[in-house]
């Protein structure tokens, strides 16, 4: 077998392989951009930056207050667009104006705001959704030199599919791709 303690990383090919599984309904990459300084005109703040795929809105829905969520075209064309959380909007646009179509600076890059969201409950991948800016996952990978690696995947199976079977299909696919024993519960973790 393989040596114990060997490390491996999820990547975009894993996402594409799992997307093809018949039990999977929605799947999203999750790429952490960490805390970043952001600004709009004279208004500044430090907020969480997350990279998601458009399916994330189906997996962990947010209420869309203005504009829209990320879509497939944003991802395919790697558009520099973002969806901002409610508190980000309040801090960077204190006048309360509609920010859609306006630009915010994230580090040295500029992004066009396409939507404002607030949580419908539940959590969003280890960040406070109201203080988070979401951009296409591929852009987080590019901006921070992550190559094709993905921090996590979020996915849902079809409603009539037993959860354990969805997990088993995913585990087998990833284990085969990364030469991991299919029964290694520590190497591939589901929650």
Predicted regions and their residues:
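Hydrophobic, regular-secondary-structure patches
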Residues: 1-48, 55, 90-91, 141-142, ...
